[in-house]
């Protein structure tokens, strides 16, 4: 079992990029969230690629707005039909949340859509050129994501309660004032 988590600062328009990669003989889970600098009311961009077996992969990517109860949407991208009850659209998840269940050999079929979402996000960031450093706008978002994060139960089963709570509470809600590029391995 191995877990690698990484927090870094990337580029002129981003405060933080968080990555988590968890592997064991049966599963391979990758998560990342890009946090843009503030002042332009932009969403974060989140992506999960979760392989739980040779037959089950869950792929999720979305524009995750830090404002609570704000329904963010991008014209021209697919809109979710609401069948994925775990993701509450308008509560940090957009109308465009992309969720797919597939097999490992089918993941690449979704790469064109991922590129389209990422291209739209890049255009948003470049057009608005966020420069602010007021990270308080992410406080509710980070709290909500920490409470909601399904990785808590998964990690508890793999690494025990103490390590899983440490990861979820200390890493996922890392203080921006103490943020430096760092990596932790379990």
Sequence positions of predicted segments:
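Mature, well-folded catalytic/scaffold domains that follow N-terminal targeting or propeptide regions
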Residues: 36-41, 110-132, 142-152, 172
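Extended, non-transmembrane interaction/recognition domains
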Residues: 39-40, 44-124
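Alpha-helical oligomerization segments
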Residues: 135-176
